[in-house]
Regions:
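Sec-dependent N-terminal signal peptides
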Residues: 3-14
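Short S/T/G/P-rich N-terminal loop/turn motif that feeds into the first structured element of a domain
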Residues: 18-231
Length: 231
């Protein structure tokens, strides 16, 4: 965990640019018997005054539904503007931070890390606890974003958040370049996220048109994560 965090913290300031929000993700495995300890370590550290920059949100997620190529149990994710994330990195160099990393290292095994940014978002802002993540390789971001915008600006349900984003650092050998993140409030919606189109012929036709106009796209994998905490 310590090596993952330090490595991406060093690279991140060269990557971020001022659009929507930026994120860094650190994936690791925790034994079930140690999860309560790890959750408390994260909550105690980022919940304490002075350990989190203004405008930064910190999330702990459980990796709930995934294929065997995503062999980790949890993710620690930071989001914010370029200025907020930059300020967070400036904080993370003192003795308290080093002690936090040392403690985390006792209970976690590193898996991977990545950094990226959102490009376009639609729907209800907020911290939706259930999130479906679709990793893709997109050949033409401009073309895909145009089709994404045309559909979601009109048909995306108001009770969720749908985001098109880009992976900038830490791409896997599978070659994902982008992702779509769908945040919802319950598992029923997560497991039937397209059901709102079933009795809406216009939405069905628009969905078909959307995917006919995205350019070349390959789905790399899909997964579902569950929010355990936010600070």
């Amino acid at each position: 965990m310590k090596n993952l965090l330090l490595g991406v913290f060093t690279l991140c300031t060269t990557f971020l640019s001022a659009q929507e929000y930026h994120w860094t993700a650190y994936n690791f495995t925790v034994a079930p018997e140690d999860l309560e300890i790890v959750g408390k370590l994260v909550g105690d550290y980022f919940g304490a005054e002075g350990n989190k920059a203004a405008g930064v949100s910190v999330f702990l997620f459980e990796n709930h539904f995934s294929d065997n190529g995503m062999n980790f149990s949890h993710s620690l994710i930071f989001t914010g503007t370029i200025d907020a994330v930059g300020a967070q990195y400036a904080l993370d160099s003192g003795a308290k931070w080093q002690l936090f990393l040392t403690k985390m290292n006792r209970y976690t095994n590193d898996y991977s890390s990545a950094a990226g940014k959102s490009v376009i978002s639609y729907g209800k802002p907020g911290s939706h606890p259930i999130q479906n993540l679709y990793s893709m390789r997109i050949e033409d971001q401009t073309k895909f974003a145009k089709a994404f915008t045309k559909y979601h600006s009109k048909y995306s349900p108001s009770d969720r958040r749908v985001t098109l984003g880009r992976v900038g650092l830490g791409r896997s050998p599978d070659g994902e370049t982008h992702y779509i993140l769908v945040g919802v409030d319950d598992f029923k919606t997560a497991m039937s996220s397209g059901s709102y189109r079933e009795n809406n012929k216009a939405a069905m036709a628009a969905w078909k048109e959307y995917w006919e106009n995205t350019g070349e796209v390959k789905l790399i994998r899909s997964s579902t994560r569950v929010m355990l905490g936010k600070w």
